[in-house]
Design a protein with these regions (language model features):
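Rossmann-like AdoMet
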Residues: 65-123, 140-167
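N-terminal, intrinsically disordered charge-dense segments
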Residues: 20, 25-39
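The AdoMet/dcAdoMet-binding core of the Class I SAM-like
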Residues: 114, 118-209, 214, 225-232, ...
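Class I S-adenosyl-L-methionine
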Residues: 251-283
């Protein structure tokens, strides 16, 4: 998938360079005709607009490519999830998408950390895998303190796909979090700021001073590169002392890796009807 993504951008980049080459003679002719006499109207602005168009097209193509391989399925608690046929994996637990999100992340991480006292600056939360935006939507009003919510996602879904999942009837903020612009902070409420980043977790810069981590990547057998010692080390270094990380995956190898980088790891009860245990790691 990642190779396909890179190939797409290389292709778009090639088209973009050709388009700029075609555009330059036109800009020069217009300048000679004095149509570009105003100092603010330069070829750079036209190039930027053209570049923006190509990036928008690339982003749309990537979203559609991702969605083509996704099917909506209803989980045991009545809420929907997406199934990725290309990797044979669901975005949420088939035992209950809403149940998993509420228990594993909102209650066991965000509310747990908030109950331990929060400074006037509030909490910074890092999510690994924005997905459908379910975790973000359920976190908006989960605590009565300021929350800066930074979510990393390499393959974004379009809001139209999430609309088909029926979350809007039970989650008032699902539309807002999915419609929020990428790569810029957006105030969903006065206390909740969302920053969705199109980024590769393996190589991007992580926010610092993180208090809560939702580690919600696809399963280790599907994305082993996301569950390495190096990845957990990067997260650990980005967190404040007392920071809390939770994940649905309670495999022994994951627990040992978390411990190895410095976390104190707890095996706690899993969601009703779902996994027997989940992991909570504290720095």
């Amino acid at each position: 998938m990642q190779k396909n993504l890179q190939a797409c951008f290389f292709a778009f980049g090639g088209i973009f360079e050709v388009s700029l080459a075609c555009l330059t003679p036109t800009v020069n002719r217009l300048r000679r005709l004095s149509l570009l006499a105003h100092p603010r109207i330069q070829e750079k602005s036209l190039q930027k607009k053209l570049q923006a168009c190509f990036f928008a097209f690339a982003f749309s193509y990537i979203c559609n490519m991702n969605e083509f391989k996704s099917e909506i399925e209803v989980t045991a608690d009545g809420s929907a999830t997406l199934y990725r046929a290309d990797i044979d994996e669901h975005y949420h637990s088939v035992k209950g998408a809403l149940t998993e999100s509420a228990h594993v992340y909102v209650n066991s991480a965000l509310r747990y950390r908030a109950s331990d006292g929060v400074s006037s600056n509030g909490l910074t939360l890092l999510e690994i895998g924005f997905g459908t935006g379910l975790n973000a939507a359920m976190s908006v009003e989960a605590v009565d303190v300021p929350v800066r919510y930074v979510s990393l996602e390499l393959y974004p879904l379009s809001p139209q796909v999430v609309e088909q999942m029926g979350y809007d009837s039970i989650l008032p903020y699902i539309g807002a979090v999915n419609a929020a612009q990428w790569n810029t902070p957006v105030a969903i409420t006065p206390l909740f700021t969302l920053e969705k980043r199109i980024a590769n977790f393996l190589s991007c810069d992580l926010p610092q001073g993180v208090d809560v981590v939702y580690f919600d990547a696809f399963a280790p057998e599907k994305q082993p590169e996301m569950w390495s010692r190096e990845c957990f080390q990067r997260v650990y270094q980005a967190m404040n002392p007392g920071g809390v990380l939770t994940t649905y995956c309670a495999k022994g190898v994951v627990r040992r890796l978390l411990q190895d980088v410095g976390f104190t790891v707890q095996r706690i009860e899993g969601p009703v009807g779902g996994k027997r245990e989940i992991l909570r790691a504290i720095k």
